[in-house]
């Protein structure tokens, strides 16, 4: 018997094309992706957490826009079951709109939205300068998921659109490399800033 995500979506035809991200997007077949925090004490243990569980974890802190808590996330925090329900409904919408495996669409969206370089601050003699640096694969995946969730959450906030519809729209736009996607816009911004700081 084949293991399917939530008993519905197949893992078999899903592959990661970007060789840099291949080891950091865990697509190990699981019915319900839940690791119970087994990897949290290990360095780079995050890479072993299923990618859907990482999305669920990010959905629970959706209001944190950078260091600003523009809106609170208290209505989501700790409610993993609610996060999984959002993911299931989002994947249903993606499947209906694209006629493709939503897991495949989501993985491709992460690949498209992951920034390749960013800036860091270096201090020389009391003055600070921005310096372009390569983004590690783990951070690339983290930023892609974070930006997709932020885009969806802030796109549905105080609007008649639900979080599931907003997240589906965000993932589909990132999959299509569309500038309507907040994640793609942020990626281009980050890379442009890094290019000017070389």
Curated annotation (Swiss-Prot):
GO terms (BP aspect): translation
Classification via CDD domains: uS7_Eukaryote
GO MF annotation list: rRNA binding; structural constituent of ribosome
Keyword list, A-Z: Ribonucleoprotein, Ribosomal protein, RNA-binding, rRNA-binding
InterPro entries tied to this protein: Ribosomal_uS7, Ribosomal_uS7_arc, Ribosomal_uS7_dom, Ribosomal_uS7_dom_sf, Ribosomal_uS7_euk/arc
SUPFAM superfamilies in alphabetical order: Ribosomal protein S7
Domain of life: Archaea
Gene Ontology, cellular component aspect: small ribosomal subunit
HAMAP family on file: Ribosomal_uS7_A (MF_00480_A)
Family the UniProt entry places it in: Belongs to the universal ribosomal protein uS7 family.
Matches recorded under NCBIfam families: PRK04027.1, uS7_euk_arch
Subunit structure: Part of the 30S ribosomal subunit.
Protein name stated in the entry: Small ribosomal subunit protein uS7
Species in which this protein is naturally found: Nanoarchaeum equitans (strain Kin4-M)
Gene name of the record: rps7
């Amino acid at each position: 018997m084949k293991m399917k995500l939530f008993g519905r979506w197949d893992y078999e035809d899903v592959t990661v094309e970007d060789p840099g991200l291949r080891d950091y997007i865990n697509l190990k077949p699981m019915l319900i992706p839940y690791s119970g925090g087994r990897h949290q004490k290990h360095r780079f243990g995050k890479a072993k957490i299923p990618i859907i569980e990482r999305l669920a974890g990010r959905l629970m802190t959706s209001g944190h826009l950078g260091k600003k808590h523009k809106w609170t996330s208290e209505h989501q925090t700790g409610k993993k079951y609610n996060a999984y329900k959002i993911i299931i409904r989002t994947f249903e919408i993606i499947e209906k709109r694209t006629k493709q495996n939503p897991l495949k669409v989501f993985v491709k969206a992460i690949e498209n939205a992951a920034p390749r370089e960013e800036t860091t601050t270096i201090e020389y003699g009391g003055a600070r300068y921005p310096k372009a640096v390569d983004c590690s694969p783990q951070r690339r995946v983290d930023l892609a998921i974070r930006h997709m969730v932020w885009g969806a959450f802030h796109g549905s906030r105080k609007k008649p659109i639900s979080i599931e519809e907003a997240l589906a729209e965000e993932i589909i736009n990132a999959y299509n490399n569309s500038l309507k996607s907040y994640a793609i816009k942020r990626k281009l911004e980050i890379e442009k800033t890094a290019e000017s700081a070389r």
